[in-house]
Amino acid sequence: MYPQFRRGHLAAAVLFASSSLLGGQALAEDERLEELDERAESVVQLGDEVVLGTAEQELKQAPGVSIITAEDIRKRPPVNDLSEIIRTMPGVNLTGNSSSGQRGNNRQIDIRGMGPENTLILVDGKPVSSRNSVRYGWRGERDTRGDSNWVPPEEVERIEVLRGPAAARYGSGAAGGVVNIITKRPTDRLRGSMTVFTNIPESSKDGATRRANFSLSGPLTEALSFRAYGSANKTDSDDTDINLGHTVNPSRTVAGREGVRNRDLSGMLSWQVTPDQVVDFEAGFSRQGNIYAGDTQNNNGTANTQGLADDGAETNRMYRENYAITHNGTWSFGTSRFVAQYDSTRNNRLEEGLAGSVEGQIGADRSFSASKLENYRLSGELNLPLHALFEQVLTVGAEWNKETLNDPSSLKQGFVGSDSLPGTPAAGSRSPKSKAEIRALYVEDNIELRPGTMLTPGLRLDDHSDFGLNWSPSLNASQTLGEYFTVKAGIARAFKAPNLYQSNPNYLLYTRGNGCPIQTSSGGCYLVGNENLDAETSVNKELGIEFRRDGWVAGLTYFRNDYKNKIVAPLDVMGQTGTGNNILQWSNAKKAVVEGLEGNLLVPLHEDLSWSTNLTYMLQSKDKDTGNPLSVIPEYTLNSTLDWQASERLSTQLTSTIYGRQEPPKHGTSRNTPVVSRKEVGTYGIWGVSAGYTFSENLSVRGGVSNLFDKRLYRQGNSFDAGAATYNEPGRAYYVSMTTSF
């Protein structure tokens, strides 16, 4: 079975303080210990022997780690996407992958300003990367909502958000951080539940939401148990004229938020082969479709896109299948975990242009194209308690991942006239397929040098089939200072391999001139994939101090990421065709830097009343080549929660989020936008209030008001003409959820 954990209330209380502080949420007193005992993993017990926790468990106590519990989600239910509650964690915002403002309402999870492409999403520790099936645009954006909406909120046991050095152990794509969504496991007796949720905006121009889900779980035999859940969710799109009168350029069509139609079905069969061996079999199917609101990449809508929006058409849909077998074992020498995983994503969408101003614009013929992304993954690790010199737990592990992509539509951009490019065949002769493999070995050691002094060194080696070896060393340390203070520090080298569009010489984009780099004076431009790229790397550092006494918890963490080789569409031309068109390749930029502070405060005002706050303050975030930010995020973000357990049955919560000013890019990078708008988004706040009542063990209701003071933002364009005003903030809305169970 799983490693047995010492379930002392002291360990649980420490974890409670950490989760309340870092997550900005408070749990009801009568549920705290029961829920958090499940996570008291700081001490592992093998038979009668008590040993230290693993390196992974120790790193989850680092300054850059937050926990969102099922109770947090129940008290603050997301309207549609888990990213809505994840964004309330320190260091987390929602934004695009660049400062362009394109697809401005498709905001994804950004951790410490490193952009969504540097945020790795896991479900039960397994990578989820369906967004990689969506074409990667010239400015670094994808027309996707990301990978944070594959699990219904009601089926989440907890969410772990890892930032900085603690995330580097997870390999490619985790340079910003990791979001690990842990689902609920099979129960020890037959249980079932059903939840319905509705969110009704006060303004008829904002899209409403209806959601329903069920779950069923329990034993089948003494050794066999199961869990199954399903959900259906619909969020309407915003009205097509929601931004009318607010756009900087009235001739442009600036769309609101698109709607979604989601369906999820998942099952798990858990087999306890022996008291010390458990094998889980998992399978799931999800369908995500949009309800089109009229968005185009360059806000240049047509009669065709307007008609699709008026009809509420579904212009893209994604089908995801996932299968996994997981073995967890406890042995006389330690513990083990092995995972075999396969997932595929079919991405069906109306075909879009690939050239110039019509890049990302749906074609008039309304024909669907399809791409298919497949991932094959194997991983395994051993945790070995050792007693030589110091008490320690050594972790050794290996991973293998093969990613394949078949995307004919995105590779069909042709040459102009008699142009040709070395290494890039004509459109009809290109293979639509690309692939990559990564093999990895890693070793970590969690060492107790002396009571109160922990040292966790690690080393990871990744071997990419196209880009060779990458070493990722790490070192984390923790030192208690007396009874109340703890200092924690970490440094790690993280990396991200080029994606299957950036590295594919068959992937070609074209602009007749306006979208060319600002340094060019004439001719059109081709942007082509580059199979000689280097991996992106980042040296992530953090230093934090924590104070704990009598229920009070306070912390302050400094972080800095020195980012190298970010892959971008370059400003420099590598050559010209015979007709005078410019040739560019995806290239590695030189350096960028992200730096900031994270602060936390938990105040136990009363036995049943707590106040928790977290603050993120960005000192700098910029590409040193262009001076532009890596992504547009607030100067600071303040999340605060006042949680009152009024009675055994009644709980209430008051929440607020204050966003500091958001600065746009400072410098234009393309020929048609040598000067960009300097319009900022000023400081604003979003408040919410909710209350929940438990009628019985089998029936509970919760309702609330979001955006209590109706603070709205309107999308005004892309960054070159609207600065930072590139997204909609919806207005006041009323929600209610009801859960019945047996």
UniProtKB/Swiss-Prot annotation:
Keyword check for Membrane: yes
Membrane topology of this protein: Multi-pass membrane protein
Phenotype when the gene is knocked out: Deletion decreases sensitivity to siderophore-beta-lactam drug conjugates. In a pvdD and pchEF double mutant background, in iron restricted culture, able to grow in the presence of enterobactin or various synthetic catecholates, but fails to grow when enterobactin receptor pfeA is also deleted. In a pvdF and pchA double mutant background, in iron restricted culture, growth inhibited by 60% in the presence of dopamine and delayed in the presence of other catecholamines such as epinephrine; growth is inhibited further, but not completely abolished, when piuA is aso deleted.
GO molecular function: enterobactin transmembrane transporter activity; porin activity; siderophore uptake transmembrane transporter activity; signaling receptor activity
Intracellular or extracellular location(s): Cell outer membrane
Gene Ontology CC, one term: pore complex
Keywords: Cell outer membrane, Disulfide bond, Ion transport, Iron, Iron transport, Membrane, Porin, Receptor, Signal, TonB box, Transmembrane, Transmembrane beta strand, Transport
Main location as per UniProt: membrane
Positions of transmembrane segments: none
Record-linked PROSITE patterns: TONB_DEPENDENT_REC_2, TONB_DEPENDENT_REC_3
Domain (TBDR plug) ranges: 57-184
Extent of motif TonB C-terminal box: 725-742
Signal sequence segment: 1-28
Matching PANTHER family: TONB-DEPENDENT OUTER MEMBRANE RECEPTOR, TONB-DEPENDENT SIDEROPHORE RECEPTOR PROTEIN
Family: Belongs to the TonB-dependent receptor family.
Protein name: Ferric enterobactin receptor PirA
